Amino acid sequence: MNLAAYYPVLLFLLVGTGLGIALVSIGKLLGPNKPDVDKNAPYECGFEAFEDARMKFDVRYYLVAILFIIFDLETAFLFPWGVALRDIGWPGFSAMMIFLLEFLLGFAYIWKKGGLDWE
Protein backbone atom coordinates (compact mmCIF):
# COMPACT_ATOMS: atom_id res chain seq x y z
CA MET A 1 0.00 0.00 0.00
CA ASN A 2 1.41 3.36 -1.06
CA LEU A 3 1.11 5.86 1.80
CA ALA A 4 2.77 8.66 -0.16
CA ALA A 5 -0.62 9.62 -1.58
CA TYR A 6 -1.78 10.52 1.96
CA TYR A 7 1.07 12.95 2.68
CA PRO A 8 -0.87 16.02 1.45
CA VAL A 9 -3.78 15.11 3.74
CA LEU A 10 -1.43 14.66 6.69
CA LEU A 11 0.27 17.96 5.91
CA PHE A 12 -3.12 19.69 5.67
CA LEU A 13 -4.17 18.29 9.07
CA LEU A 14 -0.89 19.23 10.74
CA VAL A 15 -0.84 22.76 9.34
CA GLY A 16 -4.51 23.31 10.21
CA THR A 17 -4.10 22.00 13.75
CA GLY A 18 -0.88 23.94 14.29
CA LEU A 19 -2.38 27.15 12.95
CA GLY A 20 -5.46 26.77 15.12
CA ILE A 21 -3.41 26.15 18.27
CA ALA A 22 -1.08 29.04 17.42
CA LEU A 23 -3.91 31.52 16.89
CA VAL A 24 -5.70 30.55 20.10
CA SER A 25 -2.43 30.76 22.04
CA ILE A 26 -1.59 34.19 20.62
CA GLY A 27 -5.07 35.42 21.52
CA LYS A 28 -4.70 34.13 25.09
CA LEU A 29 -1.25 35.68 25.50
CA LEU A 30 -1.86 39.07 23.89
CA GLY A 31 -5.55 39.60 24.64
CA PRO A 32 -6.74 41.62 27.61
CA ASN A 33 -7.60 39.60 30.70
CA LYS A 34 -9.66 41.75 33.05
CA PRO A 35 -12.31 39.56 34.66
CA ASP A 36 -14.94 41.24 36.81
CA VAL A 37 -18.28 40.30 38.35
CA ASP A 38 -20.31 41.13 35.25
CA LYS A 39 -18.07 39.18 32.89
CA ASN A 40 -18.14 36.10 35.10
CA ALA A 41 -21.92 36.20 35.65
CA PRO A 42 -24.10 33.74 33.72
CA TYR A 43 -25.74 35.32 30.68
CA GLU A 44 -29.45 34.90 30.14
CA CYS A 45 -30.75 36.94 27.18
CA GLY A 46 -29.43 40.23 28.54
CA PHE A 47 -31.16 39.85 31.90
CA GLU A 48 -29.87 38.81 35.28
CA ALA A 49 -30.26 35.09 35.85
CA PHE A 50 -33.46 34.72 37.83
CA GLU A 51 -33.75 30.93 38.05
CA ASP A 52 -31.53 27.94 38.43
CA ALA A 53 -30.23 26.69 35.09
CA ARG A 54 -31.23 23.13 35.98
CA MET A 55 -34.97 23.48 35.61
CA LYS A 56 -37.34 20.80 34.39
CA PHE A 57 -38.52 20.87 30.79
CA ASP A 58 -41.76 19.57 29.45
CA VAL A 59 -41.29 16.15 27.87
CA ARG A 60 -42.90 17.43 24.66
CA TYR A 61 -39.74 19.41 23.87
CA TYR A 62 -37.77 16.18 23.87
CA LEU A 63 -40.43 14.48 21.76
CA VAL A 64 -40.28 17.23 19.15
CA ALA A 65 -36.47 17.08 19.17
CA ILE A 66 -36.49 13.31 18.62
CA LEU A 67 -39.09 13.61 15.87
CA PHE A 68 -37.00 16.31 14.19
CA ILE A 69 -33.92 14.09 14.26
CA ILE A 70 -35.85 11.16 12.80
CA PHE A 71 -37.35 13.14 9.93
CA ASP A 72 -34.09 15.01 9.37
CA LEU A 73 -32.34 11.67 8.92
CA GLU A 74 -35.01 10.73 6.43
CA THR A 75 -34.17 13.75 4.30
CA ALA A 76 -30.47 12.92 4.68
CA PHE A 77 -31.21 9.54 3.08
CA LEU A 78 -33.24 11.17 0.31
CA PHE A 79 -30.38 13.23 -1.10
CA PRO A 80 -27.95 10.44 -2.03
CA TRP A 81 -30.89 8.38 -3.27
CA GLY A 82 -31.90 11.19 -5.61
CA VAL A 83 -28.35 11.58 -6.88
CA ALA A 84 -27.93 7.86 -7.57
CA LEU A 85 -31.46 7.20 -8.86
CA ARG A 86 -30.40 6.66 -12.48
CA ASP A 87 -27.79 4.10 -11.46
CA ILE A 88 -29.90 2.09 -9.01
CA GLY A 89 -32.96 1.81 -11.25
CA TRP A 90 -36.34 0.41 -10.26
CA PRO A 91 -35.14 -1.73 -7.33
CA GLY A 92 -33.66 1.36 -5.65
CA PHE A 93 -36.74 3.41 -6.46
CA SER A 94 -39.10 0.82 -4.99
CA ALA A 95 -36.92 0.40 -1.88
CA MET A 96 -37.01 4.14 -1.24
CA MET A 97 -40.76 4.26 -1.78
CA ILE A 98 -41.18 1.54 0.85
CA PHE A 99 -38.87 3.53 3.14
CA LEU A 100 -40.92 6.70 2.60
CA LEU A 101 -44.17 4.81 3.13
CA GLU A 102 -42.90 3.54 6.49
CA PHE A 103 -42.04 7.08 7.55
CA LEU A 104 -45.37 8.39 6.32
CA LEU A 105 -47.16 5.72 8.36
CA GLY A 106 -45.06 6.64 11.39
CA PHE A 107 -45.88 10.31 10.93
CA ALA A 108 -49.60 9.53 10.63
CA TYR A 109 -49.40 7.40 13.80
CA ILE A 110 -47.67 10.21 15.72
CA TRP A 111 -50.22 12.71 14.48
CA LYS A 112 -53.17 10.46 15.38
CA LYS A 113 -51.79 9.76 18.88
CA GLY A 114 -51.47 13.53 19.48
CA GLY A 115 -47.69 13.62 19.64
CA LEU A 116 -47.66 16.94 17.80
CA ASP A 117 -50.39 18.64 19.89
CA TRP A 118 -49.40 21.26 22.48
CA GLU A 119 -52.64 21.38 24.45
UniProtKB/Swiss-Prot annotation:
Per the UniProt entry, the Enzyme Commission number(s) are 7.1.1.-
Subcellular compartments: Cell inner membrane
GO terms, molecular function: NADH dehydrogenase (ubiquinone) activity; NADH:ubiquinone reductase (non-electrogenic) activity; quinone binding
Primary enzyme class: translocase
Q: Which residues cross the membrane?
A: 7-27, 63-83, 88-108
Q: Which GO cellular component terms are attached?
A: NADH dehydrogenase complex; plasma membrane
In the bilayer, the protein is annotated as: Multi-pass membrane protein
**What are the entry keywords?**
Cell inner membrane, Cell membrane, Membrane, NAD, Quinone, Translocase, Transmembrane, Transmembrane helix, Transport, Ubiquinone
Extract the InterPro entries matched here. NAD(P)H_OxRDtase_bac/plastid (IPR023043), NADH_UbQ/plastoQ_OxRdtase_su3 (IPR000440), NDAH_ubi_oxred_su3_sf (IPR038430)
Q: Name one Pfam family in it.
A: Oxidored_q4
Q: Which reaction does it catalyse?
A: a quinone + NADH + 5 H(+)(in) = a quinol + NAD(+) + 4 H(+)(out)
Asked if the keyword Ion transport belongs to this entry, the reply reads no
**Job of this protein:** NDH-1 shuttles electrons from NADH, via FMN and iron-sulfur (Fe-S) centers, to quinones in the respiratory chain. The immediate electron acceptor for the enzyme in this species is believed to be ubiquinone. Couples the redox reaction to proton translocation (for every two electrons transferred, four hydrogen ions are translocated across the cytoplasmic membrane), and thus conserves the redox energy in a proton gradient.
Name the protein family: Belongs to the complex I subunit 3 family.
Q: How the protein assembles, per its UniProt entry?
A: NDH-1 is composed of 14 different subunits. Subunits NuoA, H, J, K, L, M, N constitute the membrane sector of the complex.
* Name this polypeptide is given: NADH-quinone oxidoreductase subunit A
